Amino acid sequence: MKIGYPCINLTIGCKAGRTFRLKSYSPPRLIETVAGNLDCLEAILRWNVERRILFFRITSDLIPFASHPVCRFDWRGHFREQLARIGAFVRSHEVRISMHPDQFTLINSVDEAIFERSRRELLYHAQVLDAMGLDRTAKVQMHVGGVYGNKVESLRRFVTRFAKLDAETRNRLVIENDEKSYSLRDCLAIHEETGVPVLFDSFHHSILNHGEDVYACLEWTAATWKGGDGIPMVDYSSQAAGRPTGSHTPSIDIDDFRAFIRHTRPLDFDVMLEIKDKEASALKAAAVAKEDERFTGQPGAEFPANDPA
């Protein structure tokens, strides 16, 4: 079990997802921005490993406009050495990595143009992880998508479109249950048709479910992760007090997290904390998890001095 948080470290004072307006696009602007983003990503990973935080979700904005037609720049070639160095660090310290495209990435859209944009966006995510030299345990997660007035047809369209995705994408894609439209049961049905692994979101399940116990859900989803996929990833959060249903808590509820950890023994999985204060909650969660025999991590880290390639 590894503990992680998504995209942003609020402590170290940099952002790995800096971007700019489309009208400002130019290769020099892209190079400058991406160089800064990659430097920040390295700093975040160092910080995390030193504190035994060995799961991290990389921001989708790492390479701005990478999937947009305006971007014809060979970012993989230009940043080959730095991407490889980051990948070497990730591998040497056994850090688990994921990415999560935004809610506008919809492969089951009724609009073919939206599907095509989504296909390119998913491919970009897979290419980032490939450029780092990471194996299939590094995943790209997404929601099933919209209902578009007919849930049965929309589920079928997801299955059909999944087969049209690039091989690089299918190699890394996982789907998660959401809190409004597609329950865990729906995601498991898609897995039966496609083989795509299912990531269990415990908070979403607490809102949209069919009465299934969390332990059973983790067993079912674990069975969808095969061979080189690694152990399952799980998203964890809880409801923010006084906010609309589905609002993520600003800081971890330690008692709730401790109960979650206790209830799920001995099942093993990596936990992504979708909580607003990011690394602060991750450190609190790691302090709880270190008492558990499933928790893994090692302190101390240095980046390779030379390009491993």
Please give the residue ranges for each predicted region.
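Short acidic, Gly/Ser-rich segments with clustered Asp/Glu that frequently serve as metal-coordination loops
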Residues: 182-183, 203-207
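Short, glycine/acidic-enriched loop or turn micro-motifs at the edges of active sites
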Residues: 103, 179, 204
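Short, charge-patterned binding micro-sites
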Residues: 140-145
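Domain-core and long-helix interface of multi-subunit machines
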Residues: 152, 175-181
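Alpha/beta catalytic barrel-like cores
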Residues: 1-96, 103-119, 123-134, 138-139, ...
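Loop-centered beta-sheet repeat module
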Residues: 148-156
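Conserved acidic functional residues
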Residues: 100, 201
